[in-house]
A protein has these predicted regions:
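Conserved donor NDP-sugar-binding/catalytic core segment of glycosyltransferases
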Residues: 1-31, 91, 97-99, 103
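Basic/Trp-rich segment in TM-proximal cytosolic loops or flexible interdomain/linker regions
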Residues: 109-161, 178-181
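Short glycine- and hydrophobic/aromatic-rich loop-to-beta-strand nucleating segment
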Residues: 48-61, 67, 74, 79
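Catalytic donor/gating beta->alpha subdomain of glycosyltransferases that bind UDP-sugars
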Residues: 70-133
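A generic structural signal for short hydrophobic patches within well-formed alpha-helices
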Residues: 62-63, 100
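Short, flexible, basic/aromatic active-site loop/helix in glycosyltransferases
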Residues: 10-16, 25-49, 53, 64, ...
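Membrane-embedded multi-pass helical conduit in multi-pass membrane proteins
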Residues: 143-206
Length: 206
């Protein structure tokens, strides 16, 4: 209340006792190298911070006046609510130290489907909130197309190798584990391609 915030949120983080795969998934979802830092609560992220349902607070009267979460949305309802907060002129603050340990799916096929649905939801969000899709949301789709093209171009494969190497180095440094670093390559590619595929699929069907 002392901050004057109408709504607030914080980053998601990995607890030290998370499994290696949980830490790798967290890296894929929060690193600047993968999502532009928009989920990690970084002031240097590529998009304005928007609270997500796993770490969000809002004044009750404001929540009710906006109608709460959209019940007709299966995915992306928290971002939809955050966008409505901004459209309403609410004061939304990021509390960088108010992190939540967020356990995500560690089964790669389920993780792929989860991020694929997030990519699909982005198209729905753009339909509801024109102009809300930023460059960072297009990057996974571009990456997905690039991966397909790189299969036939040697320098493309070289660039993907350098990107994977960057993920390995950064994640290993953050997690103090080369094993987590290696897993982060897998989870990062899964995250980007899954989201990109869902984004492209929904865009073509819209």
């Amino acid at each position: 209340a002392q901050t004057g915030a109408d709504a607030f949120g914080g980053p998601d983080a990995a607890s030290p006792d998370f499994s290696p795969m949980q830490k790798a998934v967290n890296f894929a979802m929060t690193s600047f190298l993968t999502t532009g830092g928009i989920r990690g609560g970084s002031a240097d992220s590529m998009e304005q911070f928007k609270p997500r349902s796993f770490n969000m607070g809002c004044k009750r009267e404001l929540y009710l006046s906006l109608g709460g979460f959209s019940e007709d949305m299966r995915y992306g309802e928290d971002i939809d609510f955050s966008l409505r907060l901004f459209a309403h002129g609410a004061k939304v603050l990021l509390f960088p130290l108010a992190a939540v340990y967020h356990k995500r799916r560690v089964d790669l096929s389920k993780f792929f489907r989860q991020v694929m649905h997030s990519g699909e939801a982005r198209i729905d969000l753009e339909r509801r909130h024109p102009g809300s899709t930023k460059l960072v949301h297009y990057l996974p789709a571009l990456f997905t197309v690039f991966c397909a093209v790189a299969l036939f171009i040697s320098y493309g494969r070289g660039l993907l190798f350098l990107y994977a190497l960057a993920i390995l180095i950064v994640s290993t440094g953050i997690n103090q584990s080369i094993y987590v670093g290696l897993l982060s390559i897998v989870t990062s590619f899964t995250q980007l391609i899954g989201y990109g595929y869902g984004f492209i699929k929904a865009k073509l069907m819209s």
